[in-house]
Amino acid sequence: MYSAMTRSINILVEPTYLEDQSEPDQDYYVWAYHVTIENKGPETVRLRARYWKITDATGHVHEVRGPGVVGEQPLLRPGEKFEYTSGTPLGAPSGIMFGNYEMETAEGEKFEVDIPAFSLDSPHAKRMLH
């Protein structure tokens, strides 16, 4: 589990390699990632947008921007949490993802919340020792 806290908003991410949806012989590897967004602060906030930077082991970078997450712009009151699962394919057996969410308070103030960097490692990734 990977976690990051920004301005009392805690982001937890748990990636899972999906062997049954991957085709390693065709350089196609798929991961699911489960995200929990916890509002540990005193303000009600709404998740407005997301940004992801996904880099595979070959250095290929894919950036994703868009409104909300999984078709929603969830409202989180103090003490509430929102969870969702999504996924990403890579053309290499490993990679890394990170990003941020744009949040907005009830007063209209917007701020970014960090999504922690997390590794995407399949059993097909070659391990390197230094």
Swiss-Prot record:
Start and end residues of each ApaG domain: 3-127
PROSITE patterns reported for this sequence: APAG
Protein name: Protein ApaG
Gene3D superfamilies named among the record's database cross-references: ApaG domain
SUPFAM superfamilies noted in UniProt: ApaG-like
GO process annotations (BP): error-free translesion synthesis
UniProt cross-references to InterPro entries, sorted A to Z: ApaG_domain (IPR007474), ApaG_sf (IPR036767), Uncharacterised_ApaG (IPR023065)
Any Pfam family: DUF525
